[in-house]
Amino acid sequence: MSDKTHSQADVAHKLWKAIEHHRTGMLGVSGDSHHFQPMTAFGEPETHRIWFFTSKDSDLAESAGGGAEAMFHFQSREVYACIDGRLSVDHDRARIDKYWNASVAAWYPGGKDDPNLTLLRLDSADAAVWLVDGGLVKYVLEVAKANASKTIPDVGERRDLNFQ
């Protein structure tokens, strides 16, 4: 990886901005027998929380129950991350109002008062983050250079974040 180093604050900023821009990742409960599921994320960098809309009878809502260790896997073109934390069911009406949009509404015919609607809240504890520098062109060039010189490609940086 790169010898460049980003500050912890810069890595966190890039992570939260990428989540805000791309939103979709895979959410799952650690140690649960269910597969991770694609979910739309609504991140709050100031509290290190990520909110997800789901049905109250979904595998995730049932597994989260009173709280469960969970992971959210996220990727964009420049940021890859695995965020670990505590997942719980939440019925925060202010968050429902704040994050409600046409895409969310499509899943809940009863609107914001749909009896199946609930929220999941991931209180992020830490994250492993990979920052990819230069995009696809740099990646292809670095792979070619590494194969020719028998070295490792320099495509970015891996960092750990602690949100506690």
Give the positions of each predicted feature.
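Short His-Asn-centered micro-motif
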Residues: 53-55
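Positively charged, polar, low-complexity stretches
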Residues: 14, 32-36, 62
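C-terminal edge-of-domain segments
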Residues: 2-4, 113-164
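Conserved beta-strand in the GNAT
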Residues: 38-41
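A short, Trp-centered hydrophobic/proline-enriched beta-strand micro-motif
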Residues: 16-31, 68-72
